[in-house]
Amino acid sequence: MQTSLDILTETDPAIAGILQQELQRQRDHLELIASENFTSAAVLAAQGSVLTNKYAEGLPGKRYYGGCEYIDAAEQLAIDRAKELFGAAHVNVQPHSGAQANFAVFLTLLQPGDTFMGMDLSHGGHLTHGSPVNVSGKWFNVVQYGVDPNSEQLNYDTIRELALKHRPKMIVCGYSAYPRIIDFEKFRAIADEIDAYLMADIAHIAGLVASGHHPNPLPFCDVVTTTTHKTLRGPRGGLIMTKDLELGKKFDKSVFPGTQGGPLEHVIAAKAVAFGEALKPDFRDYCGHVVENAQTLAQQLQERGFKIVSNGTDNHLLLVDLRSIGMTGKQADQRVSQVNITANKNTVPFDPESPFVTSGLRLGSPAMTTRGMGTAEFTEIANIIADCLLKPEDAAVTEDCRQRVANLCSRFPLYPHLTSPVPALT
């Protein structure tokens, strides 16, 4: 039976070659970017399906186009599975991305010029939580909070003081580079004091929430957004969830027709597949290993003398503060790339460097845990990272680390069903 790559090789060898080379890169590299993961073959199959052919503006049972009976069935399945997975009363599975989901929520709950609170990007927040370069920072008055300078963790008393002073209409919690448990109940208490909405963006930790390895925000938050990839291990896309049915209807309108047109039903079907996978017992086991592996990586790097932001991690990611070894995040990112490790430079709290340089390296465990690696392999990964960063100019160390990476990758194959040879690029 022909794979999608086989078909592409026959019809468009140029793009087939690019795809095959990217597949080989993913196979040959240690993927440690915290926001990346490897979907199952089933998710890939659903996303590359005939559902891409169908326009389906509206919601299941309320479409503006005919011929949507099977589209409705797929989307409703995604909705029902997401409700079961997170314990939500209302779910919209149509946002094309987490950023789209967040913008739809802002459009629903805020008016231009309203004040909201979100975490500073340099402390672990996200662009869509009020960065001045994002629409969230252009349309609204943003009060940013950060972490405590000593613990490098959230200080809820300080956040409360800011909230009482500025009285925002909404508080956003949930982050892109925060390695610790978030206390949603404390955020709820703060929001209630000022009669504010509470929004949680769990894009990074959604899989951990679904599996019980991180507290669920839904009992405490008015609305929860997430992406469907990262720790949830689905296709790239967004999700909006709430326990409030009336608010849910408003979010639906802000997605369509407010910010989007036709939904990507092939992606929604792939979301349904991923949610179904996440409802199975082995997904809980997987997420447990994700946390164990991240903690192992942090501990082993600490033993090699590296400073870890907040002194560890409770979730899937960790931040390495490189100032102690006189290296920038940009330099470290480039250095680990030389030995076929993919990571990303990242600001650390109170970072003196620009976002284009940074003082930190963000590392995550989800992707390589998906490939089957455990604490023994993550111990070796930590030592490879330490060896190559501590001796950045040593060619022998570079070659040794590259070979150790190759050995690890060969033991844990990726997508073995995709076996097409690499076609020549033209």
Curated annotation (Swiss-Prot):
Database matches in InterPro entries: PyrdxlP-dep_Trfase, PyrdxlP-dep_Trfase_major, PyrdxlP-dep_Trfase_small, Ser_HO-MeTrfase, Ser_HO-MeTrfase-like, Ser_HO-MeTrfase_PLP_BS, SHMT-like_dom
N6-(pyridoxal phosphate)lysine PTM positions: K230
Cellular-component GO terms for this entry: cytosol
Enzyme class: transferase
Amino acids binding (6S)-5,6,7,8-tetrahydrofolate: L121, G125, H126, L127, S354, P355, F356
Alphabetical list of SUPFAM superfamilies matching this protein: PLP-dependent transferases (SSF53383)
Major location (coarse): cytoplasm
Protein name, entry field: Serine hydroxymethyltransferase
Record gene name: glyA
